């Protein structure tokens, strides 16, 4: 495992621990100065404050000079630690709430920065099989949940728990500052294409998908919490380890074939959660709801975090988009909390109908998002290949060979069939998608994929872009 990957796991994992731990700690302290309804209301306020922090990171990074930024980071770090201790004093509802609002504003700011810096770690290889972005997010999430479990169950003193949170934040801040200065020195990695209408459309679709999914998962969360709060069952802390395992598993599954199966996996998890909401509403077993909730919550957290981080590469404002997943999730969780509770207290048939309608709408959006994402990735691949082609133009002039001669030499060296040479030639000269190329060649999509796969095996490459990049590199060597 690379050093940059390990640091990313540590930085993002500690952020998850500090953010979730701060939320748990704030709720416990607020319980001393208000009733249960007041705690829920205060929690919604601080989560809303964190959303503002996530949104402020990008414009502040753009406006502040480098020296002022480093000073701001240092002062903000001290302020975060002070806010933890102000909350511990809990001298009154207003003082505790104000400290919480400021604390989560700063945590949101740093959280957005952490997501962006982790995304930049994998920017250069995001379109290759070497990229492990989702896996890194999954490992970080599991690490953060494990730290929270240790803090809540192995440390009995509240003061010691707060000190542990502050020390963890200090470590995260150190990693944050080192990585941020490294990015400033090396320069930010952007997409090879400028953000256009397709990229913005994909981003808006993802926001709507995460918003609708948040409502479904918040409803399932509230269904489990209501039974726990009513004394029907004791959730305890141990099931949270299931949450860590599901997040870890999701990260590895989402990275298969550069995220090709990410949306379909999330679709299946969402379908399972929707069925579970219906089952619990109809008086089904609580244990089923508990297991499905923790499994699905881990998959969902990795989904929205890694999806927005991937999307940030195609956006002009990468600093904003990288951490937008957590911001959208927090905002929608606050905005839909009362609606999901109302839904659970409604007649069972109303809950079932609304859950199924939301599932249907989200299903359509996922399908459209998948298609839009494919088009955007295809355009990025064509842009990369166009750059490679320009590099080889001088080679063609120098060696005075036409493209047919190069193809003939390539085919001879790697034992390509005449049909495979025809397919390769079409791929080199066309920016169309697979369906249009298959029509051009008068073959089926399956046959086209089979020819590409055969050439991949002969050249020891992966996928279309890998084959073409290998061809251009081979020309340069010759």
Question: What do these predicted ranges mean?
Answer:
Residues 2-51, 205, 209-230:
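Helix-loop boundary and gating motifs at the non-cytosolic
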Residues 53-70, 246-261:
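Helix-to-loop junctions at the C-terminal end of transmembrane segments
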Residues 95-115, 285-302:
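Hydrophobic core of transmembrane alpha-helices in multi-pass small-molecule transporters
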Residues 112-127, 299-315:
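Intracellular juxtamembrane helix-capping segments at the cytosolic ends
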Residues 261-301:
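C-terminal transmembrane helical hairpin of 12-TM major facilitator-type secondary transporters
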Residues 315-345:
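A late C-terminal transmembrane helix in Major Facilitator Superfamily
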Residues 390, 394-450, 472-477:
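Helix-turn-helix DNA-binding segment
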Residues 457-474:
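Short, Lys/Arg-enriched C-terminal cap helix and immediately downstream tail that follows
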């Amino acid at each position: 495992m690379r050093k940059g990957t390990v640091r990313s796991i540590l930085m993002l994992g500690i952020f998850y621990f500090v953010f979730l731990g701060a939320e748990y700690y704030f709720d416990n302290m607020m319980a001393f100065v208000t009733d249960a309804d007041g705690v829920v209301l205060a929690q919604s306020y601080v989560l809303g404050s964190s959303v503002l922090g996530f949104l402020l990171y990008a414009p502040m990074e753009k406006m502040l000079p480098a020296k002022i930024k480093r000073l701001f980071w240092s002062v903000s770090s001290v302020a975060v630690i002070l806010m933890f201790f102000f909350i511990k004093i809990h001298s009154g509802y207003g003082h505790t709430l104000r400290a919480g609002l400021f604390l989560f504003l700063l945590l949101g700011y740093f959280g957005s920065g952490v997501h962006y810096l982790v995304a930049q770690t994998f920017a250069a290889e995001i379109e290759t099989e070497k990229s492990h972005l989702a896996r890194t997010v999954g490992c970080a999430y599991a690490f953060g949940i494990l730290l929270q479990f240790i803090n809540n169950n192995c440390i009995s003193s509240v003061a010691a728990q707060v000190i542990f949170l502050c020390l963890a934040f200090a470590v995260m801040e150190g990693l944050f500052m080192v990585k941020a200065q490294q990015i400033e020195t090396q320069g930010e990695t952007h997409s090879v294409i400028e953000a256009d209408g397709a990229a913005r459309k994909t981003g808006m679709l993802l926001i709507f998908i995460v918003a609708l999914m948040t409502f479904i998962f918040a409803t399932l969360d509230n269904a489990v919490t209501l039974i726990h709060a009513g004394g029907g069952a004791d959730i305890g802390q141990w099931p949270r380890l299931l949450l860590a395992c599901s997040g870890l598993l999701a990260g590895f599954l989402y990275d298969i074939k550069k995220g090709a199966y990410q949306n379909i996996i999330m679709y299946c998890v969402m379908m399972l959660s929707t069925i579970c909401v219906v089952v619990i509403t109809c008086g089904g077993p609580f244990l089923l709801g508990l297991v499905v909730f923790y499994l699905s919550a881990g998959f969902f957290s990795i989904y929205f975090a890694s999806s927005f981080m991937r999307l940030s590469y195609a956006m002009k404002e990468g600093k904003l988009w990288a951490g937008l997943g957590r911001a959208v999730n927090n905002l929608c969780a606050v905005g839909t909390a009362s609606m999901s509770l109302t839904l659970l207290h409604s007649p069972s048939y109303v809950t079932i109908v609304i859950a199924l309608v939301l599932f249907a709408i989200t299903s359509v959006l996922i399908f459209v998002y998948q298609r839009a994402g494919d088009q955007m990735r295809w355009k990025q691949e064509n842009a990369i290949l166009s750059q490679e082609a320009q590099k080889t133009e001088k080679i063609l002039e120098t060696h005075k060979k036409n493209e047919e001669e190069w193809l003939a030499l390539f085919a001879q060296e790697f034992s390509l069939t005449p049909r495979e040479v025809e397919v390769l030639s079409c791929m080199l000269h066309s920016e169309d998608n697979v369906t249009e190329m298959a029509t051009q060649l008068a073959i089926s999509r399956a046959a086209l994929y089979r020819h590409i796969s055969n050439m991949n095996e002969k050249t020891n490459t992966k996928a279309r872009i890998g084959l073409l990049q290998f061809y251009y590199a081979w020309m340069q060597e010759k």
